[in-house]
Amino acid sequence: YQGVQKVDGVEYFFWSDGQLATYDYDGISTATSNNYLVSYNKNGIVIEKVKIEGNKWIKFNNNWYYYDQDLYPYQGIHTIGDATYYFLSNGQLATSGFEGNITTVREGNKYYAYDYTGKVVEQVDIVGNKWIEFNGGKYYFDSELTPYSGIQTIDGVEYYFNYGQLAEYLDEVVTSGDTLAYVRDGKVIEKAKFKDNELIYLNGNCYYYYLNDAGYYYPYDGEYTVDGKSLYFIYGMLQTSDSDEILTDYRNDYLYAYNN
């Protein structure tokens, strides 16, 4: 048996080797078989079966699908009627959860943003060495259309990027390669090179990192002795207070107390 077969009045789904399609976990699995979309449970029992037809919307397993006239699933960006949609590789319309949610995706040399219904609401060409405004953010790519990441200099100004997007939302200390930097509104305000097992002073705070065997800098976390003093760090930053107040922190089954 292969695909959907009826046994004793019940429809089951079988793999190509004749084995009943069962699994140990709860939930519903889906498959395509003989131009049908099929969903089945962990016992291999068919829950839903919908015939695949070309050039029409198909509702299956509470999702929408679209196939061309040769019954190939739509993938990526496609225009149907007066609207443009984004589809996953299996032909499923890429809905994004809840109303008001916007998801972005790169297809070739374009960026697309689609809403919770899968409808494309914005698109922009990706060009190199030029600021691109998209979905409320700013992006930058090099001449090979590779997105900027980490600290980059544009027109003499240092910026910080996350996968091509200017990190305008940050107001914190970040890492970029061998550099520790304070970033605000996407710009690098202050920076310092990492030092192995040496205190680093940045933006009014003190940091402590070490170089691991893989060649990456990692923050100290917890109590460590530096220059004969017992200091307490959380993710690399020395913990201090603005007064003589004693502060505490519970970590790794220990309660630590520290002052300014």
State each model region's role.
Residues 1-260:
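Extracellular adhesion/carbohydrate-binding repeat motifs centered on closely spaced tryptophans
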